[in-house]
Each structure stands twice: as C-alpha cells, then as structure tokens.
C-alpha cells in the first residue's frame, strides 16, 4: 500500500496540503494551478494545465516555512497521458531557489537526473515520488515542465504534495 503524506485530511480520497497560493506561467481555462493543491486526486478534470505551451512553470507558496524531505507529483489521473516526462523541482529558501540534493524518483529507477536537477523519466507515470536531502525553511516549491507524454505536450498536474509528518493511505490509484 502506498501513502501520501500530508497534515490535514478530509477523507481517504481528499486531503489539504499546506499550500496557500500559486502563480504560473499560464493557467489553462478550468485548470488553474490552485487545483493542484485542492486535495482532489480522483478526477481527470482537476489540476494545473497550461495548454501545452512549454516551457511552463508553477510556483506553490507554503503557509509557513517548513522542512521538506520528499515531494509527490500526481499527474494525468484517469488519463493515458498528460503526465510528466522532463521537469525540474526547486525550493525557495532564504530568498533564493535551491535544487534538492541527492534527488531520486522512487517509481523510476531509470530516471535521468541532470546536474542542474532536471529530471527525465523513462516513461509517463501517474505518481512521481521524489526523495532528496532534507531542505529546511522552504517558503515555496516550483516545478518547471519542459516535456510530457501528451501529444500536445500539455500536463495535468493533479496534485503536488510535500512531505509532512502524518500519513493516510489513498485508494485505487496508488
């Protein structure tokens, strides 16, 4: 059984991450970056998308500075595409962007991780669990996307979930 980590739960299918706002290079109609932290992981019509206009980015502000040791990126739920392939995650700490060290993707042992932190997955996967050296005082998390497995290079980032202390199992997708 897989677990997604978070602080506040509503039910086994919904949770609330401690993000409070976001900005993005583009928000596709009906797919605002705010939907990537609304706690809904069971709907293909929910999440952040950008009309396939890459490179694309979204930055998610946390409610308070916190220590993050892992991050889950859920994409393309109820789809056979619109999932991440090439992307980069960085954390805003003390007025600068930091790339996580010792970065790994749990579900893809063949993922290529460049020296600048850019991750290229071997195939599209619905859940990318990123582990890395702990980063303290994180204010925001940013994802830069350059490639997906969709024909139009669009993404639906269903949820972005930072590691927090409590765990709750999610149902059929994980």
Q: Model segments located where?
A:
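Extracellular beta-strand elements of beta-rich domains used
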Residues: 4, 71, 89, 160-162
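Extended extracellular/luminal ectodomain segments enriched in beta-structured repeat modules
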Residues: 54-55, 63-72, 137-140
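Exposed beta-strand and adjacent loop surfaces of beta-rich binding modules
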Residues: 68, 84-88, 102
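Short, surface-exposed beta-strand/strand-loop-strand elements in extracellular ectodomains
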Residues: 80-95
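Short, surface-exposed tryptophan/glycine-enriched loops
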Residues: 122-140
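Short beta-strand-plus-loop segments that form exposed binding edges in beta-rich domains
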Residues: 143-151
């Amino acid at each position: 059984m897989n677990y997604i980590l978070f602080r506040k739960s509503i039910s086994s299918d919904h949770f609330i991450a401690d993000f409070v706002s976001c900005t993005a290079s583009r928000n596709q109609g009906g797919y605002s970056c705010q939907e990537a932290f609304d706690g809904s992981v069971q709907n293909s019509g929910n999440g952040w998308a950008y009309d396939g206009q890459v490179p694309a980015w979204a930055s998610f502000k946390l409610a308070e500075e916190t220590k993050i040791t892992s991050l889950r990126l859920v994409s393309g739920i109820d789809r056979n595409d619109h999932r991440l392939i090439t992307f980069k995650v960085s954390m805003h700490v003390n007025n600068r962007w930091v790339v996580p060290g010792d970065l790994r993707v749990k579900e893809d042992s063949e993922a290529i991780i460049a020296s600048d932190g850019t991750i290229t997955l071997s195939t599209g996967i619905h859940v990318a669990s990123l582990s890395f050296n702990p980063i303290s005082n994180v204010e925001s998390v940013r994802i830069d996307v350059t490639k997906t497995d969709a024909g139009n290079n669009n993404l639906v980032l269903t949820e972005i979930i930072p590691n927090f202390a409590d765990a709750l199992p999610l149902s059929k997708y994980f």
